[in-house]
Protein backbone atom coordinates (compact mmCIF):
# COMPACT_ATOMS: atom_id res chain seq x y z
CA UNK A 1 0.00 0.00 0.00
CA UNK A 2 1.15 3.57 -0.66
CA UNK A 3 1.55 6.13 2.11
CA UNK A 4 -1.84 7.55 1.18
CA UNK A 5 -3.39 4.14 1.55
CA UNK A 6 -1.58 3.74 4.87
CA UNK A 7 -3.47 6.73 6.26
CA UNK A 8 -3.93 6.33 9.97
CA UNK A 9 -7.11 4.98 11.47
CA UNK A 10 -7.86 3.87 14.99
CA UNK A 11 -8.03 0.16 14.10
CA UNK A 12 -4.65 0.32 12.42
CA UNK A 13 -3.24 2.04 15.50
CA UNK A 14 -4.63 -0.71 17.75
CA UNK A 15 -2.95 -3.35 15.61
CA UNK A 16 0.37 -1.49 15.67
CA UNK A 17 0.21 -1.27 19.47
CA UNK A 18 -0.65 -4.98 19.76
CA UNK A 19 2.28 -5.96 17.55
CA UNK A 20 4.70 -3.58 19.27
CA UNK A 21 3.72 -4.91 22.70
CA UNK A 22 4.14 -8.50 21.46
CA UNK A 23 0.52 -9.26 22.33
CA UNK A 24 0.39 -10.90 18.91
CA UNK A 25 3.16 -12.17 16.66
CA UNK A 26 0.91 -11.83 13.63
CA UNK A 27 -2.62 -10.63 12.98
CA UNK A 28 -5.55 -12.61 11.63
CA UNK A 29 -8.68 -10.80 10.45
CA UNK A 30 -11.77 -12.18 8.77
CA UNK A 31 -14.69 -11.23 6.58
CA UNK A 32 -17.74 -13.15 7.91
CA UNK A 33 -20.82 -12.64 5.68
CA UNK A 34 -24.07 -14.49 6.18
CA UNK A 35 -24.93 -16.21 2.86
CA UNK A 36 -28.50 -14.90 2.77
CA UNK A 37 -28.15 -12.32 0.02
CA UNK A 38 -25.74 -10.54 -2.28
CA UNK A 39 -22.94 -8.33 -0.99
CA UNK A 40 -23.34 -4.56 -1.31
CA UNK A 41 -20.98 -1.60 -1.20
CA UNK A 42 -21.12 -1.58 2.61
CA UNK A 43 -19.74 -5.12 2.65
CA UNK A 44 -17.07 -4.00 0.19
CA UNK A 45 -15.87 -1.49 2.79
CA UNK A 46 -15.45 -4.31 5.31
CA UNK A 47 -13.75 -6.54 2.74
CA UNK A 48 -11.25 -3.84 1.80
CA UNK A 49 -10.60 -2.94 5.44
CA UNK A 50 -9.98 -6.51 6.63
CA UNK A 51 -7.96 -7.70 3.65
CA UNK A 52 -5.86 -4.55 3.41
CA UNK A 53 -5.01 -4.73 7.13
CA UNK A 54 -4.00 -8.35 6.70
CA UNK A 55 -1.86 -7.44 3.70
CA UNK A 56 -0.23 -4.40 5.31
CA UNK A 57 0.86 -6.25 8.45
CA UNK A 58 1.81 -9.50 6.68
CA UNK A 59 -1.03 -11.24 8.44
CA UNK A 60 -3.88 -13.42 7.23
CA UNK A 61 -7.51 -12.79 6.36
CA UNK A 62 -10.11 -15.55 6.32
CA UNK A 63 -13.40 -15.72 4.48
CA UNK A 64 -15.98 -17.29 6.78
CA UNK A 65 -19.61 -17.91 5.96
CA UNK A 66 -21.70 -17.23 9.04
CA UNK A 67 -24.26 -19.85 8.09
CA UNK A 68 -26.16 -20.47 11.33
CA UNK A 69 -29.65 -19.72 9.98
CA UNK A 70 -30.69 -22.56 7.63
CA UNK A 71 -34.01 -21.03 6.58
CA UNK A 72 -32.47 -17.98 4.89
CA UNK A 73 -29.21 -19.25 3.45
CA UNK A 74 -28.37 -20.75 0.09
CA UNK A 75 -25.37 -21.99 -1.89
CA UNK A 76 -26.25 -19.40 -4.57
CA UNK A 77 -25.23 -16.69 -2.14
CA UNK A 78 -22.11 -18.59 -1.07
CA UNK A 79 -20.87 -18.70 -4.66
CA UNK A 80 -21.78 -15.08 -5.40
CA UNK A 81 -19.90 -13.89 -2.30
CA UNK A 82 -16.80 -15.85 -3.25
CA UNK A 83 -16.97 -14.36 -6.75
CA UNK A 84 -17.34 -10.83 -5.37
CA UNK A 85 -14.37 -11.12 -2.99
CA UNK A 86 -12.16 -12.45 -5.79
CA UNK A 87 -13.42 -9.79 -8.21
CA UNK A 88 -12.53 -7.04 -5.73
CA UNK A 89 -8.97 -8.32 -5.92
CA UNK A 90 -8.56 -10.41 -2.77
CA UNK A 91 -7.64 -14.00 -1.98
CA UNK A 92 -8.54 -15.34 1.43
CA UNK A 93 -6.04 -17.25 3.55
CA UNK A 94 -8.59 -19.85 4.66
CA UNK A 95 -12.20 -20.55 3.73
CA UNK A 96 -14.47 -21.57 6.61
CA UNK A 97 -18.13 -22.21 7.33
CA UNK A 98 -19.54 -21.57 10.78
CA UNK A 99 -21.57 -24.74 10.28
CA UNK A 100 -18.34 -26.74 10.30
CA UNK A 101 -17.98 -25.73 13.96
CA UNK A 102 -21.44 -26.94 15.07
CA UNK A 103 -20.00 -29.93 16.94
CA UNK A 104 -17.55 -27.73 18.80
CA UNK A 105 -20.23 -25.15 19.59
CA UNK A 106 -22.49 -27.88 20.95
CA UNK A 107 -19.70 -29.04 23.26
CA UNK A 108 -19.19 -25.48 24.52
CA UNK A 109 -22.92 -25.13 25.15
CA UNK A 110 -22.79 -28.33 27.23
CA UNK A 111 -19.89 -26.80 29.15
CA UNK A 112 -21.99 -23.73 29.96
CA UNK A 113 -24.82 -25.95 31.21
CA UNK A 114 -22.43 -27.96 33.39
CA UNK A 115 -21.06 -24.72 34.87
CA UNK A 116 -24.58 -23.54 35.66
CA UNK A 117 -24.23 -20.79 33.06
CA UNK A 118 -26.99 -21.94 30.68
CA UNK A 119 -30.48 -23.40 30.95
CA UNK A 120 -33.32 -24.67 28.77
CA UNK A 121 -36.27 -22.29 28.77
CA UNK A 122 -39.86 -23.11 27.77
CA UNK A 123 -41.16 -19.54 27.55
CA UNK A 124 -42.70 -18.56 24.23
CA UNK A 125 -40.89 -15.96 22.10
CA UNK A 126 -43.49 -13.40 23.16
CA UNK A 127 -43.00 -14.22 26.84
CA UNK A 128 -39.22 -14.04 26.53
CA UNK A 129 -39.56 -10.57 25.04
CA UNK A 130 -41.95 -9.54 27.82
CA UNK A 131 -39.72 -10.95 30.57
CA UNK A 132 -36.64 -9.20 29.15
CA UNK A 133 -37.79 -5.77 30.32
CA UNK A 134 -36.84 -2.48 28.73
CA UNK A 135 -33.92 -0.08 28.73
CA UNK A 136 -35.43 1.59 31.80
CA UNK A 137 -36.93 -1.44 33.54
CA UNK A 138 -35.09 -4.61 34.65
CA UNK A 139 -36.17 -7.97 33.32
CA UNK A 140 -37.85 -10.82 35.20
CA UNK A 141 -36.29 -14.22 35.67
CA UNK A 142 -37.74 -17.10 33.69
CA UNK A 143 -39.57 -19.68 35.84
CA UNK A 144 -37.28 -22.26 34.18
CA UNK A 145 -34.08 -20.43 35.09
CA UNK A 146 -33.23 -22.62 38.06
CA UNK A 147 -33.61 -26.03 36.49
CA UNK A 148 -30.93 -28.43 37.63
CA UNK A 149 -27.82 -29.07 35.56
CA UNK A 150 -28.99 -32.64 35.00
CA UNK A 151 -32.42 -31.59 33.74
CA UNK A 152 -30.89 -28.99 31.42
CA UNK A 153 -28.43 -31.52 29.99
CA UNK A 154 -31.25 -33.97 29.38
CA UNK A 155 -33.53 -31.40 27.75
CA UNK A 156 -30.76 -29.97 25.58
CA UNK A 157 -29.82 -33.43 24.34
CA UNK A 158 -33.48 -34.12 23.54
CA UNK A 159 -33.65 -30.78 21.72
CA UNK A 160 -30.77 -31.98 19.59
CA UNK A 161 -32.49 -35.31 18.89
CA UNK A 162 -35.52 -33.50 17.52
CA UNK A 163 -38.07 -34.38 20.21
CA UNK A 164 -39.50 -30.85 20.43
CA UNK A 165 -41.24 -28.55 17.98
CA UNK A 166 -39.76 -25.35 16.62
CA UNK A 167 -40.08 -22.52 19.12
CA UNK A 168 -41.08 -24.75 22.04
CA UNK A 169 -37.74 -24.53 23.83
CA UNK A 170 -34.51 -22.54 23.66
CA UNK A 171 -31.18 -22.69 25.43
CA UNK A 172 -30.37 -19.43 27.20
CA UNK A 173 -27.22 -18.12 28.83
CA UNK A 174 -27.66 -17.51 32.55
CA UNK A 175 -26.20 -14.07 33.19
CA UNK A 176 -28.12 -11.15 34.74
CA UNK A 177 -31.77 -10.27 34.10
CA UNK A 178 -31.32 -6.87 35.75
CA UNK A 179 -28.24 -5.84 33.77
CA UNK A 180 -28.41 -2.33 32.29
CA UNK A 181 -27.07 -3.92 29.09
CA UNK A 182 -30.16 -5.64 27.76
CA UNK A 183 -28.00 -8.09 25.79
CA UNK A 184 -26.90 -9.59 29.11
CA UNK A 185 -30.44 -10.52 30.12
CA UNK A 186 -30.15 -14.26 29.55
CA UNK A 187 -29.72 -14.17 25.76
CA UNK A 188 -30.86 -17.12 23.66
CA UNK A 189 -27.90 -19.16 22.45
CA UNK A 190 -29.67 -22.10 20.75
CA UNK A 191 -33.08 -22.42 19.10
CA UNK A 192 -34.91 -25.33 17.49
CA UNK A 193 -35.27 -25.23 13.70
CA UNK A 194 -36.29 -28.37 11.83
CA UNK A 195 -34.82 -27.15 8.55
CA UNK A 196 -32.34 -28.58 6.10
CA UNK A 197 -29.01 -26.76 6.07
CA UNK A 198 -27.13 -25.99 2.84
CA UNK A 199 -23.91 -27.42 4.28
CA UNK A 200 -24.84 -29.91 7.03
CA UNK A 201 -28.10 -31.19 5.56
CA UNK A 202 -30.40 -32.65 8.22
CA UNK A 203 -27.72 -33.45 10.80
CA UNK A 204 -28.89 -30.68 13.12
CA UNK A 205 -32.28 -29.38 14.20
CA UNK A 206 -30.87 -26.92 16.74
CA UNK A 207 -28.84 -23.94 15.64
CA UNK A 208 -26.69 -21.43 17.56
CA UNK A 209 -27.59 -17.76 17.71
CA UNK A 210 -25.22 -15.14 16.28
CA UNK A 211 -24.15 -13.68 19.65
CA UNK A 212 -23.04 -17.13 20.81
CA UNK A 213 -21.64 -18.46 17.54
CA UNK A 214 -19.64 -15.46 16.38
CA UNK A 215 -17.16 -15.15 19.26
CA UNK A 216 -16.62 -18.91 19.24
CA UNK A 217 -15.95 -18.89 15.50
CA UNK A 218 -13.40 -16.11 15.94
CA UNK A 219 -11.72 -17.94 18.81
CA UNK A 220 -11.60 -21.28 16.98
CA UNK A 221 -9.89 -19.63 14.00
CA UNK A 222 -7.47 -17.65 16.16
CA UNK A 223 -8.78 -14.32 14.90
CA UNK A 224 -6.85 -11.53 16.63
CA UNK A 225 -8.96 -8.54 15.60
CA UNK A 226 -12.67 -9.13 14.97
CA UNK A 227 -13.79 -6.01 13.13
CA UNK A 228 -17.52 -5.29 12.91
CA UNK A 229 -19.89 -2.35 12.64
CA UNK A 230 -21.07 -0.05 15.41
CA UNK A 231 -24.40 -1.75 16.08
CA UNK A 232 -22.45 -4.56 17.73
CA UNK A 233 -20.73 -2.30 20.28
CA UNK A 234 -23.32 -3.12 22.97
CA UNK A 235 -22.80 -6.81 22.18
CA UNK A 236 -19.06 -6.69 22.88
CA UNK A 237 -19.36 -7.47 26.63
CA UNK A 238 -21.44 -10.51 25.68
CA UNK A 239 -18.86 -11.48 23.04
CA UNK A 240 -16.15 -11.37 25.71
CA UNK A 241 -18.37 -13.26 28.20
CA UNK A 242 -18.88 -16.19 25.83
CA UNK A 243 -15.17 -16.39 24.99
CA UNK A 244 -14.31 -16.48 28.70
CA UNK A 245 -17.09 -18.75 29.99
CA UNK A 246 -16.70 -21.21 27.10
CA UNK A 247 -13.02 -21.39 28.06
CA UNK A 248 -11.72 -20.71 24.58
CA UNK A 249 -7.95 -20.90 24.28
CA UNK A 250 -7.67 -18.01 21.85
CA UNK A 251 -9.06 -14.63 22.94
CA UNK A 252 -10.05 -12.41 20.00
CA UNK A 253 -10.76 -8.70 20.36
CA UNK A 254 -13.90 -7.18 18.89
CA UNK A 255 -13.48 -3.69 17.43
CA UNK A 256 -16.37 -1.65 16.01
CA UNK A 257 -16.29 0.92 13.23
CA UNK A 258 -18.97 3.04 11.56
CA UNK A 259 -21.02 1.37 8.84
CA UNK A 260 -21.16 2.91 5.39
CA UNK A 261 -24.11 5.14 4.53
CA UNK A 262 -24.38 6.69 1.06
CA UNK A 263 -26.79 9.35 -0.15
CA UNK A 264 -29.69 8.14 -2.31
CA UNK A 265 -28.77 4.53 -1.55
CA UNK A 266 -30.57 1.72 0.25
CA UNK A 267 -28.08 -0.35 2.24
CA UNK A 268 -30.46 -2.71 4.02
CA UNK A 269 -30.24 -6.27 2.68
CA UNK A 270 -33.91 -6.78 3.57
CA UNK A 271 -34.95 -3.72 1.56
CA UNK A 272 -32.75 -4.67 -1.36
CA UNK A 273 -34.43 -8.07 -1.40
CA UNK A 274 -37.80 -6.32 -1.42
CA UNK A 275 -36.76 -4.33 -4.51
CA UNK A 276 -35.90 -7.61 -6.24
CA UNK A 277 -38.96 -9.55 -5.05
CA UNK A 278 -41.39 -6.80 -6.10
CA UNK A 279 -39.84 -6.44 -9.55
CA UNK A 280 -38.75 -2.84 -9.06
CA UNK A 281 -35.33 -3.89 -10.34
CA UNK A 282 -34.48 -6.79 -12.65
CA UNK A 283 -32.39 -8.70 -10.11
CA UNK A 284 -29.64 -8.46 -7.52
CA UNK A 285 -27.25 -7.35 -10.28
CA UNK A 286 -29.47 -4.60 -11.65
CA UNK A 287 -27.09 -1.70 -12.44
CA UNK A 288 -29.11 0.58 -10.14
CA UNK A 289 -28.46 -1.67 -7.15
CA UNK A 290 -25.60 -0.93 -4.71
CA UNK A 291 -24.69 -4.63 -4.67
CA UNK A 292 -21.19 -5.56 -5.79
CA UNK A 293 -22.85 -7.53 -8.61
CA UNK A 294 -24.88 -4.46 -9.61
CA UNK A 295 -21.86 -2.16 -9.52
CA UNK A 296 -19.89 -4.66 -11.60
CA UNK A 297 -22.65 -4.86 -14.21
CA UNK A 298 -23.01 -1.06 -14.21
CA UNK A 299 -19.30 -0.88 -15.07
CA UNK A 300 -17.52 0.00 -11.84
CA UNK A 301 -14.03 -1.46 -11.63
CA UNK A 302 -12.51 -3.23 -8.62
CA UNK A 303 -9.88 -0.51 -8.43
CA UNK A 304 -12.46 2.27 -8.23
CA UNK A 305 -14.34 0.53 -5.41
CA UNK A 306 -11.15 -0.23 -3.49
CA UNK A 307 -9.97 3.37 -3.81
CA UNK A 308 -13.37 4.64 -2.67
CA UNK A 309 -13.36 2.38 0.39
CA UNK A 310 -9.84 3.47 1.31
CA UNK A 311 -10.65 7.15 0.83
CA UNK A 312 -13.72 7.21 3.09
CA UNK A 313 -11.58 5.94 5.93
CA UNK A 314 -12.54 4.27 9.20
CA UNK A 315 -14.49 6.19 11.83
CA UNK A 316 -16.12 5.58 15.20
CA UNK A 317 -19.26 7.59 14.43
CA UNK A 318 -21.83 7.04 11.69
CA UNK A 319 -21.95 9.54 8.85
CA UNK A 320 -23.23 9.67 5.28
CA UNK A 321 -20.98 9.76 2.23
CA UNK A 322 -22.00 11.62 -0.93
CA UNK A 323 -22.69 9.10 -3.70
CA UNK A 324 -20.77 11.39 -6.06
CA UNK A 325 -17.60 10.38 -4.22
CA UNK A 326 -17.91 6.84 -5.55
CA UNK A 327 -18.52 8.27 -9.02
CA UNK A 328 -15.34 10.35 -8.67
CA UNK A 329 -13.20 7.24 -8.35
CA UNK A 330 -14.63 5.45 -11.39
CA UNK A 331 -14.09 8.59 -13.47
CA UNK A 332 -10.53 8.78 -12.19
CA UNK A 333 -9.90 5.17 -13.21
CA UNK A 334 -11.62 5.20 -16.60
CA UNK A 335 -10.20 8.59 -17.59
CA UNK A 336 -6.89 6.79 -17.96
CA UNK A 337 -8.03 3.48 -19.41
CA UNK A 338 -11.31 3.74 -21.36
CA UNK A 339 -11.07 3.97 -25.17
CA UNK A 340 -13.02 6.84 -26.74
CA UNK A 341 -15.85 6.54 -29.23
CA UNK A 342 -18.68 8.64 -30.64
CA UNK A 343 -22.27 7.54 -30.19
CA UNK A 344 -25.62 9.18 -30.86
CA UNK A 345 -28.28 8.05 -28.40
CA UNK A 346 -31.23 10.12 -29.68
CA UNK A 347 -30.50 10.39 -33.40
CA UNK A 348 -31.49 13.03 -35.92
CA UNK A 349 -30.36 12.64 -39.53
CA UNK A 350 -28.19 15.39 -41.02
CA UNK A 351 -27.77 15.44 -44.82
CA UNK A 352 -24.82 17.36 -46.31
CA UNK A 353 -26.36 18.40 -49.61
CA UNK A 354 -23.12 19.53 -51.27
CA UNK A 355 -21.14 16.43 -50.32
CA UNK A 356 -20.70 14.02 -53.26
CA UNK A 357 -23.35 11.30 -53.29
CA UNK A 358 -22.09 7.76 -52.90
CA UNK A 359 -18.69 8.86 -51.64
CA UNK A 360 -17.09 8.62 -48.22
CA UNK A 361 -13.73 9.34 -46.64
CA UNK A 362 -11.74 8.19 -43.66
CA UNK A 363 -11.00 10.67 -40.91
CA UNK A 364 -8.59 10.28 -38.03
CA UNK A 365 -9.85 11.23 -34.57
CA UNK A 366 -7.71 11.25 -31.43
CA UNK A 367 -8.47 8.53 -28.88
CA UNK A 368 -7.64 10.68 -25.88
CA UNK A 369 -7.19 14.45 -26.28
CA UNK A 370 -5.19 14.48 -23.02
CA UNK A 371 -2.85 11.66 -24.05
CA UNK A 372 -1.15 11.84 -27.46
CA UNK A 373 0.36 8.40 -26.94
CA UNK A 374 -3.17 6.94 -27.12
CA UNK A 375 -3.02 7.53 -30.86
CA UNK A 376 -5.87 8.00 -33.31
CA UNK A 377 -8.61 5.86 -34.80
CA UNK A 378 -10.12 5.79 -38.26
CA UNK A 379 -13.75 6.91 -38.63
CA UNK A 380 -15.68 7.05 -41.90
CA UNK A 381 -17.54 10.19 -43.00
CA UNK A 382 -20.15 10.50 -45.75
CA UNK A 383 -23.05 12.58 -47.03
CA UNK A 384 -25.44 11.49 -44.27
CA UNK A 385 -24.64 11.45 -40.57
CA UNK A 386 -26.60 11.21 -37.34
CA UNK A 387 -26.34 13.90 -34.70
CA UNK A 388 -27.99 14.21 -31.30
CA UNK A 389 -31.52 15.56 -31.54
CA UNK A 390 -30.74 17.93 -28.67
CA UNK A 391 -27.90 19.44 -30.74
CA UNK A 392 -30.42 21.08 -33.05
CA UNK A 393 -33.04 23.72 -32.20
CA UNK A 394 -35.27 25.49 -34.67
CA UNK A 395 -35.79 28.46 -32.36
CA UNK A 396 -32.83 28.50 -29.99
CA UNK A 397 -32.38 30.66 -26.90
CA UNK A 398 -29.49 33.08 -26.59
CA UNK A 399 -26.04 31.55 -26.12
CA UNK A 400 -27.10 28.34 -27.84
CA UNK A 401 -24.04 27.54 -29.93
CA UNK A 402 -25.09 24.28 -31.49
CA UNK A 403 -26.97 23.80 -34.75
CA UNK A 404 -29.94 25.94 -35.80
CA UNK A 405 -31.09 27.40 -39.15
CA UNK A 406 -28.36 29.65 -40.53
CA UNK A 407 -25.79 28.66 -37.89
CA UNK A 408 -22.49 26.92 -38.49
CA UNK A 409 -20.83 24.35 -36.19
CA UNK A 410 -17.95 21.91 -36.42
CA UNK A 411 -18.65 18.21 -36.68
CA UNK A 412 -16.07 16.69 -34.32
CA UNK A 413 -12.93 15.70 -36.26
CA UNK A 414 -14.56 16.59 -39.60
CA UNK A 415 -15.85 19.83 -41.16
CA UNK A 416 -17.83 22.96 -40.53
CA UNK A 417 -21.48 22.49 -41.53
CA UNK A 418 -24.20 25.14 -41.88
CA UNK A 419 -27.92 24.42 -41.49
CA UNK A 420 -29.95 25.51 -44.51
CA UNK A 421 -33.19 23.53 -44.39
CA UNK A 422 -35.37 21.70 -41.87
CA UNK A 423 -37.49 18.70 -42.95
CA UNK A 424 -40.58 17.83 -40.87
CA UNK A 425 -43.24 15.13 -40.91
CA UNK A 426 -47.01 15.66 -40.99
CA UNK A 427 -47.02 16.22 -37.22
CA UNK A 428 -44.47 18.98 -37.39
CA UNK A 429 -41.69 16.83 -35.95
CA UNK A 430 -38.22 17.48 -37.33
CA UNK A 431 -37.10 14.34 -39.20
CA UNK A 432 -33.88 15.57 -40.78
CA UNK A 433 -31.88 18.69 -41.38
CA UNK A 434 -30.06 19.69 -44.53
CA UNK A 435 -26.69 21.36 -44.33
CA UNK A 436 -23.80 22.39 -46.52
CA UNK A 437 -20.19 21.80 -45.61
CA UNK A 438 -17.01 23.76 -46.30
CA UNK A 439 -14.28 21.43 -47.62
CA UNK A 440 -11.62 23.95 -46.56
CA UNK A 441 -12.44 23.48 -42.87
CA UNK A 442 -11.34 19.88 -42.45
CA UNK A 443 -9.97 19.14 -38.98
CA UNK A 444 -6.21 18.84 -38.81
CA UNK A 445 -5.53 21.02 -41.87
CA UNK A 446 -4.79 24.14 -39.84
CA UNK A 447 -7.74 26.12 -41.20
CA UNK A 448 -8.00 29.52 -39.45
CA UNK A 449 -10.24 31.45 -41.85
CA UNK A 450 -13.08 31.72 -39.35
CA UNK A 451 -14.17 30.22 -36.06
CA UNK A 452 -17.31 28.55 -34.80
CA UNK A 453 -18.44 28.39 -31.18
CA UNK A 454 -19.99 24.93 -31.24
CA UNK A 455 -18.58 21.45 -31.83
CA UNK A 456 -20.96 18.50 -31.93
CA UNK A 457 -20.41 14.79 -32.36
CA UNK A 458 -21.88 12.49 -34.99
CA UNK A 459 -21.76 9.02 -36.52
CA UNK A 460 -21.72 8.08 -40.20
CA UNK A 461 -25.29 7.05 -41.06
CA UNK A 462 -23.95 4.65 -43.69
CA UNK A 463 -21.41 3.00 -41.40
CA UNK A 464 -22.57 2.73 -37.80
CA UNK A 465 -23.84 0.11 -35.39
CA UNK A 466 -27.32 0.17 -33.83
CA UNK A 467 -27.10 0.12 -30.05
CA UNK A 468 -29.20 0.51 -26.94
CA UNK A 469 -28.10 2.97 -24.27
CA UNK A 470 -29.33 2.67 -20.70
CA UNK A 471 -29.11 5.89 -18.70
CA UNK A 472 -29.40 5.75 -14.92
CA UNK A 473 -30.37 8.11 -12.15
CA UNK A 474 -30.33 7.32 -8.40
CA UNK A 475 -32.90 4.67 -7.51
CA UNK A 476 -33.81 6.56 -4.33
CA UNK A 477 -34.87 10.21 -4.51
CA UNK A 478 -34.11 11.29 -0.94
CA UNK A 479 -30.63 11.64 0.50
CA UNK A 480 -31.22 8.86 3.01
CA UNK A 481 -33.03 5.54 2.77
CA UNK A 482 -35.41 6.70 5.49
CA UNK A 483 -36.63 10.29 5.55
CA UNK A 484 -39.10 11.56 8.13
CA UNK A 485 -40.64 8.13 8.52
CA UNK A 486 -41.52 7.65 4.86
CA UNK A 487 -41.63 4.10 3.55
CA UNK A 488 -38.61 3.72 1.32
CA UNK A 489 -40.70 2.44 -1.61
CA UNK A 490 -42.37 5.86 -1.70
CA UNK A 491 -38.96 7.33 -2.52
CA UNK A 492 -38.32 5.25 -5.64
CA UNK A 493 -37.26 7.43 -8.57
CA UNK A 494 -39.65 6.72 -11.49
CA UNK A 495 -36.94 7.99 -13.88
CA UNK A 496 -34.13 5.83 -12.53
CA UNK A 497 -33.80 4.09 -15.92
CA UNK A 498 -34.14 5.60 -19.40
CA UNK A 499 -33.59 3.37 -22.45
CA UNK A 500 -32.51 5.04 -25.70
CA UNK A 501 -32.06 3.53 -29.15
CA UNK A 502 -29.21 5.00 -31.15
CA UNK A 503 -25.98 4.33 -33.01
CA UNK A 504 -22.28 4.01 -32.24
CA UNK A 505 -19.25 4.26 -34.49
CA UNK A 506 -17.84 1.03 -36.01
CA UNK A 507 -14.82 0.95 -33.67
CA UNK A 508 -17.20 -0.68 -31.17
CA UNK A 509 -18.10 -3.57 -33.48
CA UNK A 510 -15.99 -6.01 -31.47
CA UNK A 511 -17.22 -4.77 -28.08
CA UNK A 512 -17.63 -7.54 -25.54
CA UNK A 513 -19.55 -7.64 -22.25
CA UNK A 514 -17.86 -5.54 -19.57
CA UNK A 515 -15.84 -3.52 -22.13
CA UNK A 516 -15.81 0.14 -21.14
CA UNK A 517 -15.86 3.26 -23.31
CA UNK A 518 -15.86 6.98 -22.90
CA UNK A 519 -18.58 8.15 -25.27
CA UNK A 520 -17.89 11.69 -26.39
CA UNK A 521 -20.01 14.19 -24.42
CA UNK A 522 -22.16 11.42 -22.87
CA UNK A 523 -20.02 9.80 -20.20
CA UNK A 524 -18.50 6.44 -19.39
CA UNK A 525 -20.37 3.34 -20.53
CA UNK A 526 -20.09 -0.40 -19.96
CA UNK A 527 -21.25 -3.15 -22.33
CA UNK A 528 -24.05 -4.88 -20.44
CA UNK A 529 -23.30 -8.60 -19.86
CA UNK A 530 -26.95 -9.64 -19.46
CA UNK A 531 -28.74 -8.02 -22.39
CA UNK A 532 -25.98 -7.79 -25.00
CA UNK A 533 -26.13 -10.40 -27.76
CA UNK A 534 -24.66 -10.83 -31.25
CA UNK A 535 -27.39 -8.65 -32.74
CA UNK A 536 -28.11 -6.35 -29.79
CA UNK A 537 -25.39 -4.15 -28.33
CA UNK A 538 -26.43 -2.68 -24.97
CA UNK A 539 -24.49 -0.03 -23.04
CA UNK A 540 -24.99 0.97 -19.41
CA UNK A 541 -23.97 4.50 -18.52
CA UNK A 542 -21.69 4.20 -15.50
CA UNK A 543 -21.36 7.94 -14.85
CA UNK A 544 -21.53 11.19 -16.74
CA UNK A 545 -18.27 12.86 -17.79
CA UNK A 546 -18.19 15.53 -15.13
CA UNK A 547 -19.43 16.25 -11.63
CA UNK A 548 -19.35 19.22 -9.29
CA UNK A 549 -17.99 16.93 -6.57
CA UNK A 550 -14.51 17.79 -5.27
CA UNK A 551 -12.45 15.30 -3.29
CA UNK A 552 -11.26 17.04 -0.13
Curated annotation (Swiss-Prot):
It is an enzyme of class 6 (ligase). It is found in: Cytoplasm. A motif ('KMSKS' region) lies at residues 266-270. GO terms for biological process: glutaminyl-tRNA aminoacylation; glutamyl-tRNA aminoacylation. Gene3D superfamilies: Glutamyl-trna Synthetase, Domain 2, Glutamyl-tRNA Synthetase, Domain 3, HUPs, Ribosomal Protein L25, Chain P. Its EC number is 6.1.1.18. It catalyses: tRNA(Gln) + L-glutamine + ATP = L-glutaminyl-tRNA(Gln) + AMP + diphosphate. Pfam families: tRNA-synt_1c, tRNA-synt_1c_C, tRNA-synt_1c_C2. A motif ('HIGH' region) lies at residues 33-43. Keywords: Aminoacyl-tRNA synthetase, ATP-binding, Cytoplasm, Ligase, Nucleotide-binding, Protein biosynthesis. The keyword Lyase does not apply. It comes from the Bacteria. Transmembrane segments: none annotated. InterPro entries: aa-tRNA-synth_I_CS, Gln-tRNA-synth, Gln/Glu-tRNA_Ligase, Gln_tRNA_ligase_bac, Glu/Gln-tRNA-synth, Glu/Gln-tRNA-synth_Ib_cat-dom, Glu/Gln-tRNA-synth_Ib_codon-bd, Glu_tRNA_lig_a-bdl. GO terms for cellular component: cytosol. The keyword Protein biosynthesis applies. GO terms for molecular function: ATP binding; glutamine-tRNA ligase activity. Monomer. Belongs to the class-I aminoacyl-tRNA synthetase family. PANTHER family: GLUTAMATE--TRNA LIGASE (PTHR43097:SF5), GLUTAMINE-TRNA LIGASE (PTHR43097). This is Glutamine--tRNA ligase. It comes from Clostridium perfringens (strain ATCC 13124 / DSM 756 / JCM 1290 / NCIMB 6125 / NCTC 8237 / Type A). The lineage of its organism: Bacteria, Bacillati, Bacillota, Clostridia, Eubacteriales.
